[in-house]
Amino acid sequence: MKTKIIVIVGPTAVGKTALSIEVAKRFNGQIISGDSQQVYRGLDIGTAKIRPEEQEGIPHHLLDVREVGESYSAYDFVTEAAQAIREIAAQDQLPIICGGTGLYIQSLLEGYHLGGSVPHEEILAYRAQLDSWSDEDLFRKIAELGIEIPQLNRRRAMRALEIAHLGGSLENSQPDYEALLICLDDERERLYERINHRVDLMLEAGLLEEARWLYEQAPISQASKGIGYKELFPYFEGRMSLEEAVDTLKQNTRRFAKRQLTWFRNRMSVTFYQVGNPDYKNQVMEDIKNFLDK
């Protein structure tokens, strides 16, 4: 029998963290972070990491599990998230994955384990290339390679081409989980306003000092490539004013939110919930209850 899990995804600043706490309290759950930057100790403000006092006693997993100079891959996430799911389920509690790193979460859910030898950037670059192809292009390539896929659709075709391209580096296995995928969304203008406001709050909370610490500790690390930090490095180097750096940070965060939504829409079988709908939380709770009662 497959383990049932809840997955809460969506663009940055849409309200995933707050909802995950409510779901965990309502359904006796524990939360697994699905964010590639929140694994790093010391990166709290720029990653919008939930603070201990905000956790309301709910256990959280995969926060602060790496030093900023260390690497972290989708393979690491799949391995460690699977272990956390087993531990939570063994306690008769509900595993809840919450985050916005689509590559990591998709890899876990679809039962494909990304070998550590495959560079993260290579996987992302090839997936971006496939995203730009039409359905006709994808299906033509599938036919050329002689790949047989039952119930062929865009998502299955892209996944099969990734496996072929990476030379079998993705080990195919059946997913171990039955997941309900919840994707939060909001009107573009309102989401972008929330992003801009969040950046302002981060700066007030000490983002500049946190980014400078990262710049001094590990300026060329994987952690330093995250949005929220790298945009401030030119300011530290005297190549950009603070105002210009902050404007770049806000712009990059808005673009990132757009890419996140594209990923979830094209890559994962999510159900969208509009946070502007005053009844959306009630609908989420009802859908989770029905899912768990099946």
Swiss-Prot record:
What cofactor does this one take?
A: Mg(2+)
Q: What is its EC number?
A: 2.5.1.75
* Pfam families listed in its UniProt record: IPPT
Return the broad EC class.
transferase
- Site positions for Interaction with substrate tRNA: T101, R127
Q: Which GO terms describe its biological process?
A: tRNA modification
Which Cys pairs does UniProt list as disulfide-bonded? none
Binding positions (ATP): G10, P11, T12, A13, V14, G15, K16, T17
Q: What parts of the sequence cross the membrane?
A: none
In this chain, the stretch annotated as Interaction with substrate tRNA covers 35-38
Q: Which Gene Ontology MF annotations are present?
A: ATP binding; tRNA dimethylallyltransferase activity
Indicate yes or no for the key word Ligase.
no
List the catalytic activities from the record: adenosine(37) in tRNA + dimethylallyl diphosphate = N(6)-dimethylallyladenosine(37) in tRNA + diphosphate
Against InterPro entries, the record matches this protein to: Dimethylallyltransferase, IPT, P-loop_NTPase
Its keywords, alphabetically, are:
ATP-binding, Magnesium, Nucleotide-binding, Transferase, tRNA processing
**Gene3D superfamilies per UniProt:** P-loop containing nucleotide triphosphate hydrolases
Query: Which residues make up the binding site for substrate?
Result: T12, A13, V14, G15, K16, T17
Its quaternary organisation is: Monomer.
Q: Which NCBIfam families match?
A: miaA (TIGR00174)
PANTHER family per record: TRNA DIMETHYLALLYLTRANSFERASE
Q: Which family does it belong to?
A: Belongs to the IPP transferase family.
What this chain does, per the entry, is described as: Catalyzes the transfer of a dimethylallyl group onto the adenine at position 37 in tRNAs that read codons beginning with uridine, leading to the formation of N6-(dimethylallyl)adenosine (i(6)A).
Name of the protein: tRNA dimethylallyltransferase
**UniProt organism field:** Streptococcus sanguinis (strain SK36)
Tell me the gene name.
miaA
